[in-house]
């Protein structure tokens, strides 16, 4: 059986649904690092993603997750979150609903990127 859906996801994250597009459209600071990272992910979505097919095990997809993570937390933290998400998506990894965390834990500092790894999510 499917777990209880997270109905508050669209409300708290600024998603606009199908009319707004597939990527996160909430507010974020437009720094050069964020814009570069988001541009690279968007270029991947428009070019290479169609060749790879629908093979992501998670919702949102890994590229949507990366776009949101970089928009919310910047290129460094969002990039690490995205890398670890792609690793979790591989064989033997997790599946299902796996959103970007609402906030980073205090122990997740820029100089300790290994702490961004979240092998298992606790259901709320």
Curated annotation (Swiss-Prot):
* Superkingdom: Bacteria
Keyword rRNA-binding, does the record have it? no
Where does this protein have coiled-coil stretches? none
* Major subcellular site: membrane
Q: Where in the cell is it found?
A: Cell inner membrane
InterPro entries, sorted: Membr_insert_effic_factor_YidD
Supply the alphabetized keyword list. Answer: Cell inner membrane, Cell membrane, Membrane
Nucleus in keyword set: no
Q: Which SMART domains match?
A: Haemolytic (SM01234)
One Pfam annotation reads: YidD
Basic and acidic residues biased stretches: 1-12
* Topology relative to the membrane: Peripheral membrane protein
Disordered as annotated region, ranges:
1-26
Describe the family membership recorded for this protein in Swiss-Prot or TrEMBL.
Belongs to the UPF0161 family.
- Function in brief: Could be involved in insertion of integral membrane proteins into the membrane.
This chain belongs to which protein, by name? Putative membrane protein insertion efficiency factor
Q: Where does this protein come from, organism-wise?
A: Rhizobium meliloti (strain 1021) (Ensifer meliloti)
Upper lineage is:
Bacteria, Pseudomonadati, Pseudomonadota, Alphaproteobacteria, Hyphomicrobiales
């Amino acid at each position: 059986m499917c777990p209880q859906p997270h109905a508050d996801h669209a409300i708290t994250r600024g998603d606009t649904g199908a009319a707004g597009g597939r990527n996160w459209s909430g507010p974020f600071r437009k720094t050069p690092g964020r814009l570069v990272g988001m541009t690279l992910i968007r270029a991947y979505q428009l070019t290479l993603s169609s060749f790879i097919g629908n093979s992501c095990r998670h919702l949102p997809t890994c590229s949507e997750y990366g776009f949101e993570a970089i928009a919310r937390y910047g290129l460094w933290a969002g990039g690490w979150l995205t890398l670890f998400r792609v690793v979790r998506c591989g064989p033997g990894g997790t599946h299902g609903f796996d959103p970007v965390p609402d906030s980073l834990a205090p122990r997740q500092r820029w100089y300790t990127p290994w702490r961004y790894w979240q092998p298992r999510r606790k259901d709320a």
